[in-house]
Amino acid sequence: MVTDIRITQDKNDLLSCLQLRRTVFIEEQNVPEYEEVDGDDPNCEHVLLTIDETPVGAARLKYYDNFIKVQRVCVLEGYRGQGIGSNIINFIINYVKENGIRQSVRLGSQTHALEFYKRLGFIEFGDEYLDAGILHKDMAYQIK
């Protein structure tokens, strides 16, 4: 089994990320398409994780002045619980560290995933809020 994780390099990689998001968010979690497809994708970097060349996980990186925001983290249902989400987040943290991109990594976690992100070193801040009808809470990871 060959696992590859990368910043998307071409249109096919991006299309794979968008299809993963459609499957997880629109089809599985019933997020309205108009909320999932928000027009920010051309202005973001995207992370794709494949196993034996099959796309199974993705995330989107949006840049702000002093932080990078991780968005749209998703793993196909049949691949969850195998460390793929952790691999994606750790890849992003290392990418940010190695490239000196920003001082912190932030994200809006669905509340059911808070413990997952805490185990990876993220800290909660702010109040819970609804995004696409799903409870979320902001979290941050300080780059050391």
Question: Where does each model-flagged region fall?
Answer:
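Short amphipathic alpha-helix that is part of the acyltransferase structural core
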Residues: 1-36, 41-46, 50-52
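Short acidic/glycine-enriched loop/turn segments that link adjacent beta-strands
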Residues: 41-43, 66, 131-135
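Conserved beta-strand in the GNAT
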Residues: 48, 54-62, 67-74
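Acidic/histidine-enriched, beta-strand-rich ligand/metal-binding domains
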Residues: 78-80, 112-119
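Conserved acetyl-CoA-binding loop-helix of GNAT-fold acetyltransferases
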Residues: 81-94
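Conserved GNAT acetyl-CoA-binding A-motif
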Residues: 96-109
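C-terminal "cap" of GNAT-fold acetyltransferases
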Residues: 110, 130-144
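Conserved acetyl-CoA-binding loop of GNAT-fold acetyltransferases
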Residues: 118-128
